[in-house]
Amino acid sequence: MRKTEKMKRPHNSSHVKQEERADDSHSNSPASSKSIKQENLLKCELCSTVCSSISQLQSHTLSEHVPEKKPSISTSNSAPSTKRVACQQCEDTFEDFAQFAIHMKSHLSSVTSQLFFCPICPVGTPFRDKKSQLEHLTTQHLQIQVTQHICSICDSAFPSPQAQSVHFAEAHKKYSCTNCDFETENEKTFKEHSKQHSRQLIMYGCALCATSYPSQLHLITHVQMSHDQETFYPPSLPIPTPPSPKSTPKQRVLQCSVCDESVLGEDGLDEHRLRKHCKVRFADKCADCQEPLLNETSFVEHCLRHSKDHAHHCPVCRQSLRSDSQIHAHCAYHMSHQDSTSSTSSSPITNGFSFVCPICGEKLDDGFALIEHTKIHL
């Protein structure tokens, strides 16, 4: 008779318990605790029990579904036992529980060995391969992104587009000619090039009538036809040199306290206050005594009459006057309306200048005086 096959329970139960404790201790390790958090719960296929780890499933299967059987004498009519232990992970079957336990350990080691955890994340983020772990570690924890703006000409790096623009404007400034396609970064070279697009024009002017001509021959013809009754050919004259201007002291730039406008010198500031901020334009009476102001003499007389501690002020607008030039300036400003009305009935102004020397700028009374004056430049 064939001997019936029986599932034998390991006789050394302490050995099995030691393996279970070893599995439990292995499951309590930091790596396994991380894997438990990430893996799904395991359900026993023999009952409705749900286990959180493979080792717990093994212990449950061992204690609940593998009963301890006593050896019995098999009869010749009994059929061989075909019940085998099945793995819930890969559906492999085994003849006894010892083989099943060894097989389950391989599943546990393979699961834990396939996961790679981030050493920086507090929750221990798992990854299936080393490449994913390194990519996460680099991009999330170790990467420092720095944006730089590179100059397209000299490859210099700058932290912002504004700094790059300032560098480009200062270091690579170009001077472009508007008449041609010439470009350069040197200012001196650009000025030399600009001379190619300019021409020199010499004009010859008449000192008597202030007319100008493009050539000396045209000027001679003009003098012959306009300023000489007889045939006259003036000799070639040297180019007159204007007299050197007298050196004047440098004036300070002052600021008006009313409108903050900048003017040159104290006289310029006084004139600015008079013409821009004086509220009384014309007046025919003194503001202090209400006597009429007939002319410049009476205006000056009232300035002296109403002065206090040698401090003069205008009898019309009461503005302080520092010098005689200011007194005459205020007189001309406030009494010009009277002068203009009286001048309509009187003779024309005798101190007007109609002739000006084109060489030195001196003003002369008539044309004959201008002719005599031009002789000093010959």
Swiss-Prot record:
Protein location: Nucleus
Record-linked InterPro entries: Znf_C2H2_type (IPR013087)
A Gene Ontology BP annotation from the UniProt entry: regulation of transcription by RNA polymerase II
ZnF region ranges: C2H2-type: 42-65, 85-107, 204-226, 254-277, 284-306, 312-334, 355-377
Key words of the record: DNA-binding, Metal-binding, Nucleus, Repeat, Zinc, Zinc-finger
Basic residues bias spans: 1-14
UniProt keyword Nucleus present: yes
GO-annotated cellular components: chromosome; nucleus
Superkingdom per UniProt: Eukaryota
Start and end residues of each stretch annotated as Disordered: 1-36, 61-80, 231-250
Listed Basic and acidic residues bias regions: 16-26, 62-71
Biased composition (Pro residues): 235-246
GO MF annotations in UniProt: chromatin insulator sequence binding; zinc ion binding
Name of protein: Putative zinc finger protein C09F5.3
Native source species: Caenorhabditis elegans
Taxonomic lineage from the root: Eukaryota, Metazoa, Ecdysozoa, Nematoda, Chromadorea
